[in-house]
Amino acid sequence: MIKPEARLHILYDISKELISSFPLDNLLKAAMNALVEHLRLRDGGIVIHGSGGEPWINVRAPIGDDVRSRSLTIEQADAINRVIASGEKHFGKNSVVLPVKVNRKAIGALWIDFAQKSGAQDESLLAMIAVLIGLTCQRDRELCSDGGSVAEEQQAGQIPKIKPKPHPTQLDKIDWIVGESPALKRVLATTKIVAATNSAVLLRGESGTGKECFARAIHALSIRKSKAFIKLNCAALSETVLESELFGHEKGAFTGALLQRAGRFELANGGTLLLDEIGDVSPQFQAKLLRVLQEGEFERLGGTKTLKVDVRVICATNKNLEVAVLRGEFRADLYYRINVVPIILPPLRQRDGDISLLAQVFLEQFNNANDRNCDFGPSAIDILSKCAFPGNVRELDNCVQRTATLASSNTITSSDFACQQDQCSSALLRKADGDGIGNDAMNGLNSRDTMSGGLCAHAGTPSGAAATIEAAGLTERDRLIKAMERAGWVQAKAARILGKTPRQVGYALRRHRIDVKKE
């Protein structure tokens, strides 16, 4: 029986392996290794059939001295073949065989023989892993021009080529996402696959990586594209206001509620709702949110009539939800509800070659908005390409606009950039967090405390005091008290020091049971 807290680590490790850029067989081997590391297995493996129906990938659990010398028993082979043929899962005494599906068709199987009795929760976890494997296989096939697989072409000695489909449609075009890097193309391929379903999506990545842009892309590529796309930043509102915004309210529900008002769920009925910064929702509100996500029904604030809606919910966060679950700050059931298909957005520093493309787009937007005719000199793009951009695409946009505004001529040169004049505001972030700034934020997982990671995880720009507090090596509680003392116990001022919102600071004060002093 797998412990509840271990399931989160297993799911994270498997997801991390499957989103890598290695060949499919290597990804599946890495996933199998992760399963062996976390589970007590007697045997196990992943079998994937090629586009012609023949077995072409057979990954075996690395148990024992020589994996290659082991062959499947008649019972194992029979169970695997039946699952692939029927698309239905199979259970043995201490074993389970789950179908791996692409476009609802079983193209392989994940089979596990447990060394001890398993439970329903173990089988549920493995079912989620089988779905992730299926999405990985589908992405691999999407990258091949003839509907086969990149891995199949590589095995045949061919060089896989990414070509447009014979009859491209408007659905293949996402104008507002710019880039040609392999990291971005992988995410776009997954986005197009996920958009064709109604599955819940969790967009994860550092601040400024474009989570809202990808949410819009999922909506635009889905069958819901003709309906509304509604967004809400959960971190920007207090719990009471957040409830009213999401669920709406009746006339007279509270002071100032002069009219009945529809909430975001009602407005998004039939369409898509983006809940940004979902990791900042309080535990009390999480229970209310879980109900509408599970049942699709709710009541307006102050009302008694139950309303039903059909909404696809996309959540986004730059927080480490797994750690939040383990700390009891985020409900595990809500985590599983929103994390059906996680999409991890790469930071700008991992998108080779995209900085120059994005910079040209942002400069063109600046020219159109200000009736200017600026362009980049030869050395300007080199300067931009060497920057780490901890604020990612958002910071690059700001950098281009600021430089174009203050440039001495219409041709932007290297000397026009703030970083060449020792005036780069993001230098404080890099100094506070080191050169490897935000390396884990792409996965929403920081090894450090949430408050310490807040310098890079939030859009707010921290003050110089934040770097001092950060560098002091204090605990999260002590850092919070230190910031409040410097701010004269004014939450709004402390929030600016820490680079967080007042609501986040208020929640942290309650969580650490810190009484606010009157000065």
UniProtKB/Swiss-Prot annotation:
Chain ranges of the Sigma-54 factor interaction domain: 177-405
GO MF annotation: an example: sequence-specific DNA binding
Chain intervals for the UniProt region annotation (C-terminal DNA-binding domain): 477-519
Residues where ATP binds: 205-212, 268-277
Keyword Transcription regulation carried by entry: yes
Swiss-Prot/TrEMBL keywords: Activator, ATP-binding, DNA-binding, Metal-binding, Nitrogen fixation, Nucleotide-binding, Plasmid, Transcription, Transcription regulation, Two-component regulatory system
DNA-binding region: 491-510
Organism, scientific name: Rhizobium leguminosarum
GO terms for biological process, alphabetical: nitrogen fixation; phosphorelay signal transduction system
Subunit comment: Interacts with sigma-54.
Residue sites binding a divalent metal cation per the record: 419, 424
Protein role: Required for activation of most nif operons, which are directly involved in nitrogen fixation.
Name of the protein in question: Nif-specific regulatory protein
Region feature (Inter-domain linker): 406-476
